[in-house]
Regions:
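Solenoidal tandem-repeat scaffolds enriched in leucines and small polar residues
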Residues: 70-198
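Residue-level signature of alpha-solenoid helical repeat scaffolds
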Residues: 11-16, 45-53, 83-88, 117-124, ...
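Buried hydrophobic core positions in alpha-solenoid tandem helical repeats
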Residues: 31-33, 66-68, 103-105, 140-142, ...
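Residue-level signature of the C-terminal ends
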Residues: 17-21, 54-57, 89-93, 126-130, ...
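Conserved small/polar residues in nucleotide/adenosyl-binding loops
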Residues: 458-459
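Short inter-helical turns and helix N-cap capping residues of alpha-solenoid HEAT/ARM repeat scaffolds
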Residues: 2-3, 39-40, 74-76, 111-112, ...
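Core helices of alpha-solenoid repeat scaffolds
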Residues: 25-29, 59-64, 94-101, 130-139, ...
Length: 460
């Protein structure tokens, strides 16, 4: 047929059914061989792609001959397809390896960036350690990097990075190898690419070659955080990797990692890790308020992780420990807060009490203790004030009793907590004993023992 569209359809049908109907596919070989000499480069390229995509060992030699011929084709489109056909030739017959390497040398001598991009991709798959093939062409590949296909660029960057690490001396603050400088300059020019894979590859290359200059390309990675969630997640994972390597300071870009309401859970959790571990002391206060907002997320996983992150932030920056403690106490008073998040918040408060003064700890403990039973809560609530949420879950009740036992002797308003609240609390516990879980009962007995010991020693 003279119709290009009909020919495309025929090529697709042959590729689709070649494995299930090999005899019929073999009958079409002569047609493909004639098309390899067609004046139209599109037809020549499609014929070569179809011939190499049949994957029949009977035609392995024909495919090899077609690739050899196409490697000298006047049109770069055909030469690029010939380059991508090399792995197929190797899979059909491993004995063609040396011949394929010779073909690859021909492609590296090409002047077309599209062919060079295909050649580097095939090099990575076919002979990734044959550095002798690249020695003469290293700078040419660096200069052609910007003109390659955006999907060939990441592979080419990987190949050039591996070559540099294996064959070029490591840079220092005073000396950078000229070849490496050429590569770094070419890489820097790709940070404006609209393809996220290219930008990520640039950052990875700098991290491997010259991490001291990462700060120059890191803003391009931050720009990708405005991309769809799957791309943003990859960006955050790379930011975490760089954060652990300590080669770049992420704190100036902290707000870019703030969690959005539309972020899926997996992305929000990764962002929370970056926020907690990259915040500076001057940013900790604002971040604490931001994390407190996340605790009200509709996603339980994000809310739980936000509560934990608030505690981690307080542990990393002592200056915001008291603020974080107060924010967590406020979080526990939210009426709509889910029980798992409430339990986690009480547990984190329990772990942070040692960071504040005894008087502050006493106030926090009393506020939680009054929320164990309705009579105690009503005793301090104004008639017009909203109802106080009672801590009904087992984990929270055990944590409050533990905190109260730890601070029995702490004074508040001239009296110890043992005198202020413990007797009334124990009476309520006894009245509701049969309704309490075993862990709460055990902690209540421990509290009673701690309360009895100082009293008994006083009367001795």
């Amino acid at each position: 047929s003279t119709s290009l569209e009909v020919r495309k359809l025929v090529y697709l049908v042959v590729l689709r059914y070649a494995k299930s109907h090999p005899d019929l596919a073999l009958l079409s070989i002569n047609s493909f061989q004639r098309d390899l000499a067609d004046p139209n480069p599109l037809i020549r390229g499609m014929a070569l792609r179809t011939l190499s995509g049949i994957h029949l060992r009977e035609v392995s030699e024909l495919v090899m001959m077609a690739v050899n011929k196409a490697s000298r084709d006047p049109h770069p489109y055909v030469r690029r397809i010939a380059a991508y056909a090399l792995p197929t030739c190797y899979n059909l017959d491993h004995g063609n390896y040396e011949r394929l390497v010779e073909c690859l040398k021909t492609f590296f001598c090409d002047r077309s960036p599209s062919v060079l991009g295909a050649a580097t991709s095939i090099f990575q798959n076919l002979c990734p350690d044959r550095w002798d093939l690249l020695h003469r062409h290293f700078r040419k590949l660096c200069y052609a990097l910007g003109d390659m296909s955006e999907w060939a660029q990441p592979t080419c960057m990987l190949v050039l990075t591996r070559y540099s690490r294996a064959n070029i001396s490591k840079p220092s603050s005073t000396h950078v190898d000229p070849d490496l400088q050429v590569l770094l300059t070419s890489l820097s020019a790709q940070t404006a690419s609209m393809n996220p894979a290219v930008v990520v590859s640039v950052v990875r290359a700098f991290s491997a070659l010259f991490p001291e200059r990462l700060s120059a390309v890191f803003p391009a990675l931050i720009r990708l955080l405005r991309s769809p969630p799957d791309v943003s997640y990859v960006v955050v994972l790379h930011a975490i990797e760089l954060l652990r390597s300590s080669f770049v300071d992420i704190s100036p870009y902290l707000t870019a990692f703030y969690v959005r309401a539309s972020d899926p859970a997996y992305l929000a959790l990764a962002k929370l890790y970056v926020l907690v571990h990259s915040a500076s002391a001057s940013q900790a206060s604002d971040l604490a308020h931001e994390l407190a907002t996340y605790t009200r997320s509709s996603c339980i996983t994000v809310a739980l992780r936000s509560v934990t992150a608030l505690g981690q932030l307080a542990s990393r920056h002592e200056g915001v420990a008291l603020q974080s403690l107060q924010l967590l106490v406020n979080v526990t008073q939210v009426p709509t807060l889910s029980t798992p998040v409430l339990s986690r918040a009480v547990h984190v408060v329990q772990s942070l009490l040692h960071t504040c003064s005894p008087s502050t700890a006493a106030v926090v403990v009393v506020r939680f203790a009054l929320r164990l039973f309705v009579p105690l809560a009503n005793r301090v609530r104004d008639p017009d004030a909203p109802r106080i949420r009672i801590l009904t879950d087992t984990v929270s009740r055990v944590a409050v009793l533990w905190m109260l036992g730890l601070h029995l002797k702490t004074c508040l308003a001239g009296s110890s907590l043992l005198e202020l609240i413990v007797p009334d609390l124990l009476r309520c516990l006894v009245a509701h004993w049969s309704k309490e879980q075993a862990s709460v009962q055990c902690q209540a007995l421990t509290l009673s023992a701690k309360a009895f010991v100082p009293v008994s020693y006083t009367h001795l």
